[in-house]
Amino acid sequence: DYLEIVKRKTASLFHTGARVGAYLAGAAPSLIDETDRYGLNMGIAFQMIDDILDVVGHPDLLGKPTGMDLRDGNPALPIILAIRNGDLAVQQAFDCGTPSEPQVFAALSAIKAGSCIQEARTLSRRYAREALVSLKRFPPSKYRDGLESLVQLIIDRDF
């Protein structure tokens, strides 16, 4: 399952960093729990945006060509959504293990032409909102403002 993979990998890094930061700052246990939720949801949103950028990002700004998830056989969110929506070009490119460049191009074009990118952005925003909700239990401060800004930076990341 996509979310379980993301939770165990990318989101766990955000989760752990947020938890350790709250602990070292002397936060109350209930606030540490909220920080857990913040980090987990922010990490999920980050990975979803990263998956989107692998399709629509600019290679020079990303530092790598687009379509690497497809080439490497990684089940990135736009790929999963395209396959669920019945896109045969994406399904074939993903299933073959080592897609040719024409297959990658066709699959990426199909993903861009469909609704998958918008669906993935909507999902990423949902997790970003959940991260922000977790911060509302913290008293207003420049630190909370900074954590809120990080969420917005992740969502607005556009290469």
Regions found by a protein language model. Name each.
Residues D1-F159:
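All-alpha prenyltransferase/terpene-synthase fold signal
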